[in-house]
Amino acid sequence: MENDVRNTPQKLYVLGHPVAHSKSPVMYNAVYGKLGFPWEYGLMDCATPVEAKAFLAARDFLSVNITTPYKPEALAAATARAASAKLAHGANILVKKGDALIAFNTDGRGCVGYLERTGFSFDGAKIAICGTGPTALAILHAAAIAGASEVLLLSRDKERARDALDRYVDEFGTLAHATVDLQAAVDGHRSFLTAYDETTFKFGSYTTSTQAITAADLVINATPLGMREGDPAPFDVSLFREGQRAFDVVYAHGETAFAAGAKAAGCTFADGGGMLVAQAVATVQAVCDVSGIDCEFSFDELFEVMANAAGFNV
């Protein structure tokens, strides 16, 4: 199968709306070209869920990356789902293998992996995450696996945050207490059972958890706020404090209100460009693994090729 897939033209896409700003095509085309694969990666902008579902149902691709707002639809289209996608309730990668369509979510791994590259340690850290969608849940899970002592899930509506967190914790507990403990994919990270037992999971709203936001070692915006001009930050940016780390999953949309507030407060800030590259590396590795291809490049080598292609200084 490796030779069939590796040596024949394949179609790969990023699916979402909007996607015109996406750096994915230039990154993936660069790395697949470097690997010598005759694969073509392009944009698939579907304005409605009906269009997105029809595209996924046609399966005219080897792999698809999925961005806002179609991660739940991608999960539903899959015939097999990795734990990362199940727990996030959304997939950001679909890979075809025969009649199967396999779902993964590398958003959390990408976010944590990039921040660790910048020197941030999740071990014992308190993390506040804005949002309750698949990206936020994927990051919440990855932060727990990476060693966070406390993870706070935030929303405008406290009950919405409660519901999302309760559902995640219930599902995480089921997986963590499976017959075989799921080990971490990265050296130094925790197994599912250890992360489940040793992480304190909390929920709140932007108005009821103000002290917790200020006390957090790292505050992450995992909402779409900032993708449109004039979008506010998720919370009152006066809650930022000097010395905090702040991370915004949004990139390539100018300076967001979240970013401006974090910088003004003296936080160490990074946008989603580095996360995009790190989760893209994980995507390449997943596609190669499912396709039975031995990828001869290391994580760092793939990261460098893709970051340079996108013009990211990360």
Regions found by a protein language model. Give the residues of each.
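NAD(P)-binding Rossmann-fold cofactor-contacting core
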Residues: 148-172, 178-193
